[in-house]
């Protein structure tokens, strides 16, 4: 029929951008490259949000990956290759409205060394205690974006367990770290 158009993107209307409703991924996840200066305080800015979870890796050396989150507190770090979580005031010092601040620790701020950080906004650090699963959890969740930080104490057994994550759907991807020992990271 001559008045019909082919069904393709070229024939579909283009919606006008609405910056008031713009929910692009950059508002919730931003990678950031930076160069250390070795000073006691280095501000990393330009994220356009205050992160709740920051993952830092030195790109010039084999230093450990470090994880920080607003649920546990900024100086509480997790590293993949160490036995337990640690507290270090010279690593991540603060989450800020536009990024974060690091101290002089070599794993996050050696003069002239290059770093990458991956940064997620979740919900501002608000947690809830959940008892619906087989193991009690403390969750910081943004179900709309499908991300949550979960803390729990294992049951000490080898049986399968369930735990609440507040996402509303089965997670597609998990990162798990034993905070008390150098067990396998999953």
Regions found by a protein language model. Give the residues of each.
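Surface-exposed molecular-recognition determinants
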Residues: 1-186
């Amino acid at each position: 029929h001559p008045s019909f158009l082919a069904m393709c993107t070229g024939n579909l209307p283009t919606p006008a951008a609405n910056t008031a409703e713009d929910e692009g991924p950059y508002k919730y996840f931003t990678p950031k490259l930076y160069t250390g200066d070795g000073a006691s305080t280095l501000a990393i800015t330009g994220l356009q949000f205050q992160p709740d979870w920051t993952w830092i890796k030195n790109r010039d050396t084999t230093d450990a990956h470090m994880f920080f989150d607003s649920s546990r507190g900024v100086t509480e770090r997790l590293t993949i290759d160490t036995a337990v979580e640690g507290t270090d005031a010279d690593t991540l010092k603060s989450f800020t409205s536009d990024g974060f601040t690091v101290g002089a620790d070599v794993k996050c701020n050696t003069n002239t060394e290059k770093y990458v950080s991956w940064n997620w906004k979740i919900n501002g650090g608000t947690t809830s205690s959940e008892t619906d699963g087989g193991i009690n959890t403390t969750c910081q969740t943004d179900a709309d974006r499908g991300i949550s930080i979960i803390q729990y104490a294992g049951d000490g057994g080898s049986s399968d367990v369930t735990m609440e994550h507040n996402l509303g759907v089965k997670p597609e991807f998990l990162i798990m770290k034993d905070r008390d020992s150098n067990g396998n990271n999953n």
